[in-house]
Amino acid sequence: MFRFDNILEAWACIYKPLSHDINGHGRKTFYRIDTINNNNEFVQNYNLAATPCMAYSTLVDASRARANAKSISYRHSIYFMVKQAAPQHNAKTVVNDADTETDAKYYADEMVQDLLAFLDELKKESQRAINGNSTHQPQTAIERIVSALPKEEQMGINGLQLDGAEWGTFPMKYNRWWVCGLEIEQISPRLLCVNGEKYY
């Protein structure tokens, strides 16, 4: 089973702006949620949450790919959340609220593009691993992530349709938090045979 959430959490750990602590003892910046609008862990703790942070929707959104009946198309929903800086008003400096709001939106956009660049490299490295072209000891963070993945997960990465990724910001939510939603399609092979081991 392809667990994209685990790959995204690994990225959140090595990506400096997030610096997620996977053990939950320090800075938590990665969340597994149903939807951004539901009462989830981030929403319950937004006043204490570290900024920036990200969330992955664990809801399954899939369909049979029309162009290829042997494939399934999955749609992955990822959210980047950035808290808008509080405006500062004093005799020397007046920070326009619209400026801090724009900064938050563009910061989320920058993180989306950083993730897509990372996933592009991850796809290339997993393709090398699948083809047996990664014979050296893993050196980079990307090589270490790919080498730790089972073959099925490496194949799942190759199905990510990054060129068709779509993203955009939502109106402000949760007391000065801005959300940028990212949608990525993944094409996976469909089971064509009944697995007899799953039946009596």
Where are these predicted regions, by residue range?
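Small/polar-rich, solvent-exposed N-terminal microdomains that initiate assembly or binding
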Residues: 1-69, 134-139, 143-156
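Extracellular/virion structural assembly segments
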Residues: 2, 67-73, 80-129
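Intrinsic-disorder/low-complexity loop/linker signature
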Residues: 9, 24, 88, 97-101, ...
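Amphipathic alpha-helical interaction segments
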Residues: 12, 19, 115, 185-186
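Secondary-structure boundary elements
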Residues: 17, 124, 189-191
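Oligomerization/assembly interface segments of phage tail-like spikes and tubes
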Residues: 70-86, 172-190
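Acidic-leaning, charged glycine-interspersed low-complexity segments
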Residues: 105-185
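Protruding loop/beta-arch "assembly-hinge" segments enriched in small, turn-prone residues
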Residues: 187-200
